[in-house]
Design a protein with these regions (language model features):
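Oxidoreductase and adenylate-handling cofactor-binding alpha/beta cores
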Residues: 157-170, 181-193, 223-237
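Catalytic, metal-anchored helix/loop core of enzyme active sites in primary metabolism
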Residues: 171-174, 182-185, 189, 201, ...
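Rossmann-fold NAD(P)-binding glycine/threonine-rich loop
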Residues: 103-115, 124-151, 158-162
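Conserved active-site and cofactor/substrate-binding residues in soluble primary-metabolism enzymes
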Residues: 27, 31, 35, 80, ...
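N-terminal glycine-/serine-/threonine-rich beta1-alpha1-beta2 phosphate-ribose binding loop
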Residues: 13-115
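Substrate-binding/catalytic subdomain of NAD(P)-dependent oxidoreductase enzymes
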Residues: 197-242
């Protein structure tokens, strides 16, 4: 089964169709996962008004419970094993912020969707490698796969392709897919400096990771391109084919 547009249309979760009082489980409480939790907790009332129903965190899973995350876990169940989040009958939505295309994140995605739980992820690698399988699994179990944050973080690229441009024939997709590469290439072009020197500057400024291969080897951009191609053209294009 390919990444057809219809599968991704159905996979995107429409909040207004969900039952009242949504119970949420979050897997992964790093920088991004913790911020998701803080937003859900600190803006609980505003979000309930905005979406028309309560969004309540009932369970989380992460590596280290002792880390100070600037929000209370007192009324939230903790699991060392993320897979257990998919077994809770009261959980409506599982939010995955673990990362990685295989392993724990993929197992959790499969288990959650198989049990009819809606699945939200920012994991571009997993969607790029396994999007067809997960979208098909979501459809088969009347669940919804949401991955807006996996591409162009603060820009609603998925929603735009799914809804705003649904009546258009898209012939071309272009854009800056990786900020680290864009910074490095721009500096090399304008200053004439070599790659290693500009990369070191990017790392010092926080634009590049200490281990930058995911960005500079094109892996991150390839993952994003696989997702955008699927959404824009309904094509079955895997990461390995790019």
């Amino acid at each position: 089964c390919c990444w057809q547009k219809r599968k991704f249309v159905k996979s995107e979760f429409v909040m207004t169709k969900a039952k009242p009082g949504l119970k949420i489980a979050i897997a992964g409480l790093g920088v991004v996962g913790s911020e998701v939790a803080r937003q859900l907790i600190n803006r609980h009332g505003d979000l309930a008004i905005a979406v028309g129903q309560s969004l309540d965190i009932v369970a989380v899973s992460a590596r280290d419970r002792s880390v100070d995350r600037a929000f209370s876990l007192d009324d939230i169940d903790w699991y060392d094993d993320a897979a257990r989040l998919a077994t809770r009958d009261d959980v409506d939505i599982v939010v995955e912020m673990i990362g990685g295309s295989e392993g724990v994140a993929l197992d959790l995605a499969r288990a959650s969707l198989s049990s009819g739980k809606h699945f939200v992820t920012a994991n571009k690698a997993m969607i790029a490698h396994h999007g067809t399988e997960l979208a098909t699994l979501a459809e088969a179990n009347n669940a919804h796969l949401m991955f807006e944050a996996a591409v162009a973080g603060g820009i609603p690229a998925v929603k735009t392709l799914r809804e705003g441009l649904a009546g258009n024939q898209i012939n071309r997709v272009a854009g800056i897919l990786n900020g680290t590469c864009n910074y490095i290439l721009s500096k090399m072009e304008t200053t004439g400096r070599d790659f290693d020197e500009v990369l070191a500057d990017a790392q010092r400024l926080g634009y590049a990771e200490a281990e930058p291969s995911f960005d500079v080897d094109g892996i991150d951009a390839a993952h994003k391109l696989a997702l955008l191609t699927a959404m824009a053209f309904g094509a079955e294009l895997t990461y390995e084919q790019i």
